[in-house]
């Protein structure tokens, strides 16, 4: 999500808009002055406890100093976030608010309520106060009900499920990354169809480009004769990290000769919570990661590495032979799009937005289930067929050209007037017509 906010903010600024970014990322609350504020404004500057940081002439980062140190604690601080937003003149003066993730969206809606003295829906009888209020667009990024459905669990907290239903009813515009997410917003959250716009995320094509595999491998310390299988993302059940590990283990058993020159790189870290399938007990993601690493303890060819910044990540894409994206739920799959732009074909789950990026048999391979046997077969197929990999890589890079951040923000901005004017009293009160 940080990449999405970073790049969409830059695209808005490039289109001539002034952008104020508000973040309550706990990374800025370590009290040392060295914590990054989430990367949401796309800077490597250390913002620490600063209340405001000028990123460019057009982009300002505002830090909201709540006492939360985890995502769950942040969800319990939504009223505090709403108060802090209302205290910021730049928030009150905004012409348009684009909230990312359910916590931010709920905070923005509550900020409107608090400013107007309303305790119910923001859509009715709010008087003249809302005449100066900006319309709210929301990108969910993930939907709690969809995560429960796709992982066959009931893990997502009721607070989130209730908030997302309310957000779908009250936001002026819902931004879906793909037609599949649009369907989910309508079927799972009962959003009105005319309130949802599809705006496909983009890729930073100035960074993610095909380049020499050999040079990238030299920079990363990989040998030219190795077969590199890459996984990039959080180590979570929902992301299918266990499928990646089990598939690599099966490849080792099935084809020891091929496995002897294959290295699996898992690039990521534990985040949030991991869950068992079928409504099993919730386990901390750190525990899930330990179980994964224990499972591969005797496999020197499989290596877990911490996340890296984008300027290093592109070298991993260029150095690898295949990306695997075994997610159980995925609203889009930005990793697959970045890899494609870098000339790396993916083997991906046929879920969510991934089929928008990976065209089966043309720019990569799609797997309909999470059976490690099928994933190992797909990996083996691509590693044994250099010509096929090369063909898929070329098509993947071509297909990735459709993902452009300028088009992303244009789709959102173009949808605002039509939606706001169609939104009866609320949007009229907002002055959107």
What is each PLM-predicted segment?
Residues 223-239, 245-249, 265:
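Conserved donor-binding/catalytic core segment of Leloir-type glycosyltransferases
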Residues 180, 202:
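Carbohydrate-associated surface elements
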Residues 307, 360-361, 365-372, 381-386:
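Conserved acidic donor-binding segment of nucleotide-sugar-dependent glycosyltransferases
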Residues 328:
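Aromatic "clamp/platform" in nucleotide-sugar-dependent glycosyltransferases that forms part
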Residues 307, 315-320:
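Short alpha-helical donor nucleotide-sugar binding micro-motif in glycosyltransferases
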Residues 268, 277-308:
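Nucleotide-activated donor-binding/catalytic signature segment of Leloir-type glycosyltransferases, i.e.
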Residues 345-348, 358:
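Short hydrophobic beta-strand element within catalytic cores of glycosyltransferases
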Residues 3-7, 11-96:
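A conserved catalytic-core segment of Leloir-type glycosyltransferases
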